[in-house]
């Protein structure tokens, strides 16, 4: 179905009962074709990590239960889920009776797997679960004294490098883009690890800032950044992790990396989550 038929950016009615048909799928291939990414031979591995903070249902006695969930959609899935449809879907559980949290988890994982055409994994936690905050790892480049005048579209010609090999990790809290459909701002913290020719931090920060008025989904922004870095310096290793702030009770954190055996980020969150 075309994106114009989704509920994103439209007035919506919340369902009183569980409804898996609320989930709206978006084929990944559309945005990947624009970036020159071969969906049959992806240049990366990874997941989209969805954290949900507004999750509730009824227990067998009719008493409400609330919790939070984390779901992992693999990058080789055929589809992603449109975020507002996921919000409406989760809220359809508000008056739905489940026998256990495990049953709720099973239903959600199965529905997400069905709509994405991939094996989605995840966990649901009680609301009193202790979650620690952390700061992004690596060197922060936000305090560099630069002059900016490009806020979109993203300009990969701004990526410059030195002809010296390094292995480093850098981060920035200045990434911002806008929702492709609604234009609402998406604020993100990005952590980049790579081994290869050294990125010039000042020019790379300008590149990140050039996303400021860009209208793209979070997943496409991550894959654009990954592709632009890969094309610029052809690193031996590269990982991109973007932690977006929540909108509508959901945050999306795309993670892309070149090494299949690379581990997922910790469960710790950054302060803006």
Swiss-Prot record:
Q: Which InterPro entries match?
A: GTP-CH-I_C/QueF, NADPH_dep_7-cyano-7-deazaG_red, QueF, QueF_N, QueF_type2
What is a single Pfam family found in this protein's UniProt entry?
A: QueF
Location comes to: Cytoplasm
Reactions performed catalytically = 7-aminomethyl-7-carbaguanine + 2 NADP(+) = 7-cyano-7-deazaguanine + 2 NADPH + 3 H(+)
Please give the superkingdom of this protein's source. Bacteria
**GO terms for cellular component:** cytoplasm
Q: Which residues form a coiled coil?
A: none
Disulfide-bonded cysteine pairs: these are none
- Name any one GO molecular function: preQ1 synthase activity
Q: What keywords appear on the UniProt entry?
A: Cytoplasm, NADP, Oxidoreductase, Queuosine biosynthesis
Active-site residues (renumbered): 179, 186
**NAD in keyword set:** no
Gene3D superfamilies in the record: 3.30.1130.10
Principal subcellular localization? cytoplasm
Tell me the route in metabolism or biology where this protein functions.
tRNA modification; tRNA-queuosine biosynthesis
* Entry EC no(s): 1.7.1.13
Q: Which GO terms describe its biological process?
A: queuosine biosynthetic process; tRNA modification
What positions does the entry give for substrate binding?
81-83, 218-219
Top enzyme class, one word, equals oxidoreductase
Binding positions for NADPH per the UniProt entry: 83-84, 247-248
Alphabetized HAMAP family for the sequence: QueF_type2
Quaternary state and partners of this protein?
Homodimer.
According to its UniProt record, which protein family does this protein belong to? Belongs to the GTP cyclohydrolase I family. QueF type 2 subfamily.
| Task performed by this protein | Catalyzes the NADPH-dependent reduction of 7-cyano-7-deazaguanine (preQ0) to 7-aminomethyl-7-deazaguanine (preQ1).
Q: Which NCBIfam families match?
A: QueF
Q: What is this protein called?
A: NADPH-dependent 7-cyano-7-deazaguanine reductase
Protein's gene: queF
